[in-house]
Amino acid sequence: MDLTQKKLTKSEWEFLEVPVDKKELKILNLIFNSRENVEIKYNESKSFLEFIKMNGNLDTLHAYIYNSYFKNLVNNMIDKFNLQIKIDIPKKLIRLKSADSIRIKNLNSKIKDIRDQLYEYILLTSIYNYLKEGKNDRKMFYYYTLIHLLKNDIKNINKYVIYFIKEILITNNIQKDYKKLIKNSCEYIERNTLLIKYCNVELYKHQKDLFRNMNANRKNGKLILYQAPTGTGKTLSPIGIKKKIIFVCAAKHIGLQLAKSCISLEIPIAIAFGCKDISDIRLHYFAAKEFTKHRRTGQIFRVDNSVGDKVEIIISDIQSYLYSMRYMMAFNELNDLCWYWDEPTITLDYETHEFHEILQKNWKENEIPNIILSSATLPNQKDIFPMIRNYKSKFPLGEIENIISYECKKTIPIIDSNGYVAMPHLIFDTFKDIKSSVKFLMNNKTILRHFDIGEISKFILYCHKKTFLKERYKMLNYFEKIEDITVISLKIYYLELLSKLKKD
């Protein structure tokens, strides 16, 4: 990892100006707009009605579309699988204005081209496969998939299609057949391509918690210990915070990526890398307030970097923090600033390092009461008590907040030197070591990201086969509903079972 504290090169400045792709920009806009509402989300999938973009009486439109496009598919399934389901639609609802009817028919060729992408057809294909599986284990795959697909945030799904699918799932209920799901959890849950492809795009819970904390109106400062797995959006979280941010990182590429994202959103930023004093801070054009334009081209070619009124985020390396802090203090009230320190433990695993003195100086001379310490491996509060005490002595009214997340969508298993998956129940020889491991893991759940879901499912099934579990810890009692069984809930369940093991 490149930890050199140097100014940006010309090529690095040019890199910042390359726009992110449309998909990434949409996610960045979601984070930015979460400043006002952390519950916003979107889904790229479209229902039939959303695709044709027609307004009017929804009941009439649903009835007409069902009768014209979905009825035959549904009736074929009813006949083939002998289903006792009847869908009655009043004839008056099926009649559509001739102009609207013609408009829809004119879209038939387009509908045919993207039919497999329309949400109702995705649901109907899944329910057909569910029925086709009969008593096979794979039936559970489609049941679990449909339960989650129906929860997605898709506007105006045809209500008759929804009714048909829900009736089947209710009458063919396999809700309590947890064993089949857990046995195949790798394929049915973690690597479920349908759920991955059609899921909602929304904030992680730890981001919601962070934004609620930092965007609330309050007079006192706050130190937030922000611990969440790698790859879950921590380094983009500054975009969702209303306060003016001083983002500090040891690794230049992390800062560059955040800067590029900010520029794509047209957020006014400044860059402080390799600074020897405040005059080395550079403004991006979006942040420039006083500048000179080229008379012929009209482009900005000289910026007064000493005027930083417009800067919302300043991105700094470790050695430039104090310069960045003083620069931002010149234009903002202290309580309107936030020091966002990315990976504060970097280099601390060395006995000595050139950064240690700089880190100590930054902490000692810091004047900003709002601080976020962000890392996947951030020590727990009790392990950094002297640091907490120092913060409280400097900011007596400051609050301490822990945001600890272990949510993750992908497992990155740990493989031992022999090529086998490493898990607590596989690598420890003594009961005492397993118990010590569980105790540590309960306080450091971000490590769960490295626990293989396949080995977890084998362990869970083994525990049930040996019948030594108390009733309340058996899967049917532990999980209230089948949709509660997720990658992360299985990993927590695994820890629970490990903690309940008896020595004999």
Set out the residue ranges of the language-model regions:
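N-terminal helicase ATP-binding lobe
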Residues: 1-504
